[in-house]
A protein has these predicted regions:
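Conserved C-terminal "switch" segment of AAA+ ATPases
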Residues: 3-7, 157, 174-245, 266, ...
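Pre-Walker A (pre-P-loop) alpha-helix and adjacent loop at the N terminus of AAA/AAA+ ATPase modules
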Residues: 4-41, 46
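Conserved alpha-helical scaffold flanking the Walker A/P-loop in AAA+ ATPase domains
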Residues: 31-32, 86-106, 135
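Walker A/P-loop
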Residues: 35-73, 77, 86
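Walker B catalytic acidic pair
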Residues: 45, 108-109, 120
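P-loop (Walker A) phosphate-binding loop of NTP-binding proteins
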Residues: 46, 80, 148
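Canonical AAA+ ATPase core
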Residues: 87-92, 127-203, 208-216, 258-263
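C-terminal engagement/docking regions of AAA+ P-loop ATPases
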Residues: 237-320
Length: 320
């Protein structure tokens, strides 16, 4: 699959998903960038905005298997990864796969699970495998996690450690629909017999794997590499930031910028690609100082100030 075909495939997937989910184009783009960049997405939003429907619809459109895990305080790691069960017939243990063995996994309200269970998901996200009783099991490919957390209810939750937040390539939110969007939501509900809409499959699993490989062929000018490094360096020098973007975050920005180029149907990354992915990729990686938190500093404003402080290179590429 070439870059033009991958861009067309992205449009087809999102056009199909938009028939089921009502949200703005920026939200859909960010989800698709997570898929293309072979990363994972963190959704922080209130209940009832369509997070589960979005994850299920993306899976259906991509022709991938889908699994939903409701995280609770009593959820054990084995409830997510699976466990070894004794088979009395042949007197041996057999591995029973947990719900994480799917192409797209919705980790719902991930911050309600204890740290040990969160850590089990951490290995799966980073390594594409799980370890149970010392034995390693490979997860299906592609493997993509959409995790959600409720920003309002904090009682009885276990905030995600910075190491785990850093594993998510993109963080975004659906938000409430506009008035016209909510009316359209009701109109669609009135036109079907079931509560949840269905989505047509537009790609196969092999096509998804091929599509996710296309960003590796995108060209990135050396000046843009310098630009991205200067942006992340600037986050570490901001007086409002206690912990800036990690080197892993710099790599994720690079990967997501390439994915943005594919999404736009280009063979090369532009400065606008870097700017466009900066907020969803960088903001959630920042740890603010206590004074900044007391002053109610918005991480998005920090990213804006950083982008304004770094000189934008002039880069020109000729299409092949």
């Amino acid at each position: 699959m070439d870059i033009s075909d991958a861009s067309t495939a992205c449009d087809q997937v999102l056009d199909t998903v938009k028939g089921a989910v009502i949200a703005d184009d920026e939200f859909f783009e960010r989800i698709m960038l997570g898929v293309l960049a072979r990363g994972h997405v963190l959704l922080e939003d209130v209940p009832g905005t369509g997070k589960t429907l979005t994850a299920r619809s993306i899976a259906q459109a991509l022709g991938l298997s889908f699994s939903r895990v409701q995280f609770t305080p009593d959820l054990l790691p084995s409830d997510v990864t699976g466990t070894n069960i004794f088979n009395e017939q042949d007197r041996s243990f057999e591995f029973s796969e947990g719900p994480i063995f799917a192409n797209i996994v919705l980790a719902d309200e991930i911050n309600r699970a204890p740290p040990k269970t969160q850590a089990a998901l951490l290995e799966a996200m980073e390594e594409g495998q799980v370890t149970v009783d010392g034995e390693t099991h490979q997860l299906p490919k592609p493997f993509f996690v959409i995790a959600t957390q409720n920003p309002v209810e904090q009682e009885g939750t276990f905030p995600l450690p910075e190491a785990q937040v850093d594993r998510f390539s993109v963080k975004t939110a659906i938000g409430y629909p506009e008035l016209d969007g909510e009316v359209e939501l009701l109109r669609r509900r009135a036109g079907r017999d079931t509560r949840s809409p269905t989505v047509e499959t537009v790609l196969t699993q092999d096509q998804v794997l091929a599509m996710r490989a296309t960003p590796e062929r995108v060209r990135v000018h050396d000046d843009l590499l310098q630009y991205m490094a200067e942006i992340t360096q600037a986050t570490r020098n901001d007086r409002r930031v206690a912990v800036g973007v990690s080197p892993r975050g710099t790599q994720r920005m690079f990967e997501t910028a390439r994915a943005r180029a594919v999404y736009a149907g280009r063979e090369f990354v532009t400065p606008d690609d870097v700017k466009r992915v900066s907020h969803p990729v960088l903001a959630h990686r920042l740890v603010l100082t206590p004074d900044a938190k007391v002053s109610d500093v918005d991480k998005a404003d920090v990213v804006d100030d950083v982008l304004d402080s770094v000189d934008v290179p002039t880069v020109e590429f000729e299409a092949r």
